[in-house]
From Swiss-Prot:
SUPFAM superfamilies: Actin-like ATPase domain, Heat shock protein 70kD (HSP70), C-terminal subdomain, Heat shock protein 70kD (HSP70), peptide-binding domain. Residues 580-621 are annotated as: Disordered. This is Chaperone protein DnaK. InterPro entries: ATPase_NBD, Chaperone_DnaK, Heat_shock_70_CS, HSP70_C_sf, HSP70_peptide-bd_sf, Hsp_70_fam. PROSITE patterns: HSP70_1, HSP70_2, HSP70_3. Residues 596-621 have a biased composition (Acidic residues). Induction: By stress conditions e.g. heat shock. CDD domains: ASKHA_NBD_HSP70_DnaK-like. It comes from the Bacteria. GO terms for molecular function: ATP binding; ATP-dependent protein folding chaperone; unfolded protein binding. Keywords: ATP-binding, Chaperone, Nucleotide-binding, Phosphoprotein, Stress response. Acts as a chaperone.
Length: 621
């Protein structure tokens, strides 16, 4: 049976985990790291780079490097590379493909199923886009799980007693707070709230703005207008933020950041932790509203919370820990989990639940936002309240607003505002063919059905005629099946091209190594080899070197040269063995001719020791 993995598809970093012997294991990537940067780049050669290699070349390839694409999920955002448009789903699929490849290399078997996590406050469109990204990457997404829920699953499953857990999840691009109750294998989400546009990227941006202002004040040059300089500033900002988590100050030093009238200019400034916290106070304040909202919605007092779990790399910032402590009235948050890995571990556990590898665990999640339709006057009429446990199904009867109305348009939205237009539209469809009737008479049953992934299905049915119309809400970013199929083919094509490039590089490396070892062997053993063998081998070495000098040499051409050199190299070995055997035979014959009488004496002694004189031999030993 193919293995299922748990994937935390993050804004800045992603993690993949798997169950081994019932225990979750985080899988290290091909580079040996347990987290993979969610960065995708297109090299000038057309190769797709993902992860650390993409991040490293970002400064020299700014326009073709994409990061933090998670912030665009569920929107109509596009990026153009070589006159080709890429959606957020496709970019995310490249990251997922790498995680899939690394997991397969670790496990030694195919990975087909995955549980992928999303922020609890992700809308329907964002969840749908995440599922599509998985499909494009060649994964069957068996479940979309909220990140805080996965974290609670990983943290609380083995604790035994009933407990109330609050998960404070501040990642690279999103923020969630969730309140959960765990007991006897049941993980139940009571309430959730958050901000899909608040995360570590925003803290980085404040440092970048501060650096740009400092440099402009000192040198009169605006670095924000220089793409390459801006990229260097972003990398330095992220590094400074991390350093300020453990140090009270850091020096940001960027030599040759740009050129001025008098020559090259350098950036060097000290940033203290207190100054950094002053720059980002308002960002911290934005975490307080969702925190209070969750406690209110869950009907739980601070004193009733047993544990607070910090999730996401951004919770390592001391100011974040302090604000959580302040919100909890001085209570220390739990630091017993790895904030970068706990979500993927929870996702792997949920994958195990779905595969039947983990028994007696039930995950009850909630919908983060209310769902409803537009009714007369543009009012938002809610059918499913936020924080309703999913999966769920609700129906209500509506009627027409005009006499003899032939059709009704069902306009669906997600949000908490009173007027439909102020909420996030999810989609609309029309129920046609209604029989003529005075207004208020027709009975139209509208049903909302939310599945375990949090994806919404809506049905409208006229009770008189039995006519029915339905749709799966998929938001503005939704891709049609044909588009997804096309993107899957493109992703496979990129994977094939990348595999060919990797094969070509490996073949080239193998050839260069063979040339080096053969030349070394020739130099060290030149006097022991016959001239005809040396000439043939040197000719093959030179021919392979000429092939390797051509940048456009195909793997087949290189392989042919390697095969030919391999065959002629074998002749060197054969010649060496033949020479060694001849020397050995000559040495044996010479010894036999000159030492025959001595040999007879020695033979007699050996026979004597091994036969009659055993006692003497024993004594001598």
């Amino acid at each position: 049976m193919a293995r299922a993995v748990g994937i935390d598809l993050g804004t800045t970093n992603s993690v993949v985990a798997v169950l081994e012997g019932g225990e979750p294991t985080v899988i290290a990537n091909a580079e040996g790291a347990r987290t993979t940067p969610s960065v995708v780049a297109f090299a000038k050669s057309g190769e797709v780079l993902v992860g650390e290699v993409a991040k490293r070349q970002a400064v020299t390839n700014v326009d073709r490097t994409i990061r933090s694409v998670k912030r665009h999920m569920g929107t109509d955002w596009l990026t153009k590379i070589d006159d080709k448009d890429f959606t957020p789903q496709q970019i995310s699929a490249f990251v997922l493909q790498k995680l899939k490849r690394d997991a397969e290399a670790y496990l030694g078997e195919p990975v087909t199923d995955a549980v992928i996590t999303v922020p609890a406050y992700f809308s329907d469109a964002q969840r749908q886009a995440t599922k599509e990204a998985g499909e494009i990457a060649g994964l069957n997404v068996s479940r979309i799980v909220n990140e805080p829920t996965a974290a609670a699953l990983a943290y609380g499953l083995d604790k035994g007693d009933d407990q109330t857990i609050l998960v404070f999840d501040l990642g690279g691009g999103t923020f969630d707070v969730s309140l959960l109750e765990i007991g006897e294998g049941v993980v139940e989400v009571k309430a959730t709230s958050g901000d899909n546009h608040l995360g570590g990227d925003d803290w980085d941006a404040r440092i970048v703005d501060w650096m740009v202002k400092k440099f402009k004040d000192n040198n009169g040059v605006d670095l924000a207008a220089d793409k390459i300089a801006k990229q260097r500033l972003q990398e330095a900002a992220e590094k400074a933020k991390i350093e300020l988590s453990s140090s009270s100050e850091t020096t940001i030093h960027l030599p040759y950041i740009t050129h001025g009238e008098s020559g090259p200019l350098h950036f060097e400034e000290k940033l203290t932790r207190s100054e950094f916290q002053r720059l980002t106070t308002d960002l911290l304040d934005r975490t307080k509203g969702p925190f209070q909202s969750v406690l209110k919605d869950g009907g739980v007092a601070i004193k009733d919370i047993d544990h607070v779990v910090l999730v996401g790399g951004s919770t390592r910032m001391p100011a974040v820990t302090e604000v959580v402590k302040e919100l909890l009235g001085g209570k220390e948050p739990n630091k017993g989990v790895n904030p970068d890995e706990v979500v993927a571990v929870g996702a792997a556990l949920q994958a195990g639940v779905l595969k039947g590898e983990v028994k007696d665990v039930l995950l009850l999640d909630v919908t983060p936002l209310s769902l409803g339709i537009e009714t007369k006057g543009g009012v938002m009429t809610t059918l499913i309240e936020r924080n309703t446990t999913i999966p769920t199904k609700r129906s209500e009867i509506f009627t027409t607003a005009d006499d003899n109305q032939p059709s009704v348009e069902i306009k669906v939205a997600q949000g908490e505002r009173q007027m439909w237009a102020q909420n996030q539209p999810l989609g609309n469809f029309e129920l046609t063919g209604l029989p003529p009737a005075p207004r208020g008479i027709p009975k139209i049953e509208v049903t909302f059905d939310i599945d375990a992934n949090g994806i919404v299905h809506v049905t409208a049915k006229d009770q008189a005629s039995g006519k029915e119309q339905s749709m799966t809400i998929s938001g503005g970013s939704a891709l049609g099946k044909d588009e997804i199929d096309r993107m899957v083919r493109e992703a496979e094509q990129y994977a094939e091209e990348d595999a060919k490039r990797r094969e070509a590089v490996e073949t080239r490396n193998q050839a260069e190594q063979l040339v080096y070892t053969t030349e070394k062997f020739l130099d060290e053993n030149s006097d022991k080899l016959p001239d005809d063998v040396k000439t043939e081998v040197r000719a093959d070495v030179d021919a392979l070197k000429v092939t390797l000098e051509k940048e456009d040499a195909s793997a087949d051409d290189i392989r042919a040269g390697v095969t030919k050199l391999g065959e002629s190299s074998q002749k060197m070995g054969a010649a060496m063995y033949a020479a060694a055997e001849a020397d050995s035979a000559a040495a044996g014959g010479s010894a036999g001719a000159t030492g025959e009488s001595d040999d007879d004496v020695v033979d007699a002694e050996i026979v004597d020791e091994g036969g009659a004189d055993d006692g003497a031999e024993g004594e001598s030993k």
